[in-house]
Design a protein with these regions (language model features):
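A short, Trp-centered hydrophobic/proline-enriched beta-strand micro-motif
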Residues: 14-29, 68-72
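Short His-Asn-centered micro-motif
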Residues: 51-53
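Short, structured beta-strand-loop surface elements
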Residues: 61-126
C-alpha cells in the first residue's frame, strides 16, 4: 500500500473515531433503512466494528443482503464520511472482550456473555470523506462571494477524498 493510501486510511480512521456515531443503512426488500450505531473500533485493516443484538431487524437484513452504507457527519467541523462495504455477524468472545465497554450493559444486561449479542464487522469497499479545514466564516465569505458573482460555490478538491479500499493483502 502506498504512503498516500496509508495517509488517506489514517485520516479516514481519525474522522470516524472523532465522529463515532454512524447511520448504518441496510436493505429491506425494496427499501433502505437507516439507524444510528456507535462505532466500537476501526481496526488496523480498516474494518469497522459495532455491537448489536443478533435478533434485531438490522442483523436479519444483513443476513439477506450484506451490502451496507455507513454515514458519519459532524456539522460542527464540517466533516462527513460515507463508506460502502460488506457487513457480517461475528461471534468472537476474544473480540467482544477486547471491545467491551461497561455502557453496553444498557443493551446487554447479561454483560459480555449475553446470548443475544453479536458483533457486526463492516469491511469497506469504498469510502469518501469531506473534511473542510476552512473556518465557517471563511466558507460563509466564499459562499456569499459566489452568490454575489452569480457563480457556483466549489470547495477545494483537497477537501473531498475518495478512497478505494484494498483488503487483498
Amino acid at each position: 500500500m502506498t504512503t498516500t493510501k496509508n495517509q488517506e486510511r489514517k485520516r479516514l480512521r481519525e474522522l470516524i473515531e472523532k465522529i463515532e456515531l454512524a447511520m448504518m443503512v441496510t436493505s429491506h426488500g425494496d427499501e433502505l433503512r437507516a439507524r444510528p450505531m456507535t462505532t466500537s473500533q476501526v481496526d488496523e485493516d480498516g474494518n469497522i466494528w459495532f455491537f448489536s443484538n443478533e435478533f434485531s431487524a438490522k442483523t436479519e437484513e444483513i443476513k439477506k443482503d450484506q451490502q451496507v452504507n455507513l454515514s458519519y457527519a459532524d456539522k460542527s467541523s464540517n466533516s462527513y464520511v460515507s463508506i460502502s462495504g460488506t457487513a457480517s455477524m461475528v461471534h468472537d468472545p476474544a473480540k467482544i472482550n477486547e471491545l467491551w465497554s461497561p455502557i453496553l450493559k444498557a443493551w446487554f444486561p447479561n454483560g459480555k456473555d449475553d446470548p443475544d449479542m453479536t458483533l457486526i464487522r463492516v469491511v469497506p469497499h469504498s469510502s469518501e470523506f469531506w473534511d473542510s479545514s476552512a473556518s465557517k466564516m471563511v466558507q460563509l465569505f466564499k459562499i456569499s462571494k459566489a452568490i454575489i458573482k452569480g457563480e457556483a460555490y466549489h470547495e477545494q478538491a483537497s477537501e473531498d477524498e475518495n478512497i478505494k479500499q484494498d483488503h487483498d493483502k
